[in-house]
Amino acid sequence: MAINIEIKDRTENPIYVQVRQQIETHIRNKTVTSGESLPTPAALGQQLSVDKGEIQRAYYELEQLGLINKHTGKDFLGKPKIEYRVK
């Protein structure tokens, strides 16, 4: 899933707040639909050239707001795999 997020350097809001607000807007505007997977924190962090910890914090806050769910499963090698999906 590709979502359009822009990070602004000259703002009072930290990066994780900018990410959270923009994803929240996409969810509320139905740009992303219920059940749709979000990019992993590592993938989105790389796409935006920011630390994945910023994305993890944004996802955590979205989860606390009840907008996304965190799903833990296993990949084809049996390693733990975490997915974030829109509620």
Residue ranges and their predicted role:
Residues 30, 35, 66, 73-75:
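Glycine-centered flexibility sites
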Residues 21, 64-65, 81:
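Short linear sequence elements within intrinsically disordered, low-complexity coil regions
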Residues 38, 70-84:
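Short, Lys/Arg-rich nucleic-acid/phosphate-binding segment
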Residues 37-69:
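N-terminal helix-turn-helix
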Residues 1-38, 43, 49:
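Extreme N-terminal segment that seeds HTH/winged-HTH DNA-binding domains in transcriptional regulators
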Residues 16, 59-60, 84:
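Aromatic side chains
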